[in-house]
Amino acid sequence: MKKDFLPIILGSDENAYGTARLFHEAYDVRPLLVCAHQLIATSHSRLFDLSIVKNFDDEDVFPNALDNILRRCQEEYENLLVVPCSDYYTSLLVRHYDRFDGRIANRFISPELLASLDTKDKFYKLCEKHGLDFPKTVVCTPDERERVIDELPFPFPIVVKPENSNAHEYLHCEFEGKQKVYFFSEREAYLTMVRAMNTSGYRGKLIIQEFIEGGDDAMRVMNAYCDVNSRARMLCLGQPILEYYDPATAGNYAAILTRGDDELYTRVRSFLQEIGYVGFANFDMKFDRKTGRYVMFEINPRLGRSSFYVRAAGHNMMRFLVDDVVYDSAPEYVCNKTVALWSNVPMGILRRYVKNKALLREITSLPVTRTLFYRGDLSLKRLVRVGKQFLAQYGGFKKYYFDKETDFPKM
């Protein structure tokens, strides 16, 4: 007799580990984790079986490799649930979904919808159509990168991003000063960066935006799950209280407080339903103190890297997936209103770099949830390796931190 389901997780980062942990906590199952390379976040873990496939993230390798895995696993399991943990795995999965001939039980958005939101400029067109706010934005091609800085319709400071910082092309290009997101207070600093970028062969568009006032605690993040009929079954809002600043992870969230906002939930829920969204989604946005409105930055067609904050509030996102797809028993609709703390950094870093004293009092009064430290998976080898990386973050913040409200870096 076949078992009910097998989760197949694509990736090996913190998001992948958190996803495996969620399946373990909810169903005591052992997922299969498939990746091209194993990262520290998933090292020495007992939670999953591991399959390392050379060049698995390559367009020419991925379809056949995953199909072979699916064919093998379907002999033992009724339902195969595939959860991609990066944008490029999601993109590969969506483009080749029909090739897997129904072997994947869960559904994803269509290639057409993915193409309409996989870069920030396309996403903003959807936002405009559906009544969501977004920042003043200029999009430039590689040939326009240098001259566009003298034609901006808004003043410095500015924020600059690749059209998709998680796209394969940007992840694999190299140049001095490369980051996921850039903050500039002057023209020459911007030109220094783009001239270095122009030597890398990166041919994607650049997104140049007005800086919305506010520090890390003005940011907001929302993770969602929608069923095959585009009904939002789960929404959870978070208030980041600290971001990362080192070049490799700048803009990622280091700590989050879970929140609730009924009006925002209603707007996002309507947006997802109107565009026909299916599966997991992650929104990044910022609260604009001048207008009192939320300004959308981007949507990722998967759970966010820091999505384990949802678990801190008492909700398990994988339970919504499994109960929907396998057991047809998912709750009709859940929106979080619980306040809880998730952190990926030591408390000493929060005490030093969280400037809002009211927030600091709030976070020090709450228990903390951490993705990578799980009582059910703490071998000595894992604890040493993950713990070393965890404590090394003190050095990263000391070297790279700056106050976004008062001290933009001169790069």
Tell me the role of every PLM-derived stretch.
Residues 116-207:
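Active-site nucleotide/adenylate-binding loops and adjacent lid/helix of ATP-dependent enzymes
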Residues 247-250, 258-283:
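Oxyanion-binding "anion nests"
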Residues 184-246, 259-266, 287, 293-295:
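Phosphate-binding site of ATP-dependent enzymes
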Residues 207, 280-282, 331-335:
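Flexible, glycine/charged-enriched surface loops at secondary-structure junctions
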Residues 242-245, 249-253, 300-314:
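Glycine-rich phosphate/pyrophosphate-binding beta-alpha loops
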Residues 1-109, 143-147, 397-402:
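ATP-binding N-terminal substructure of ATP-dependent carboxylate-amine bond-forming enzymes
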Residues 272-308:
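Conserved metal-phosphate-binding beta-hairpin within the catalytic cores
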Residues 323-411:
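Peripheral (often C-terminal) accessory segments that flank ATP-dependent C-N-forming ligase machineries
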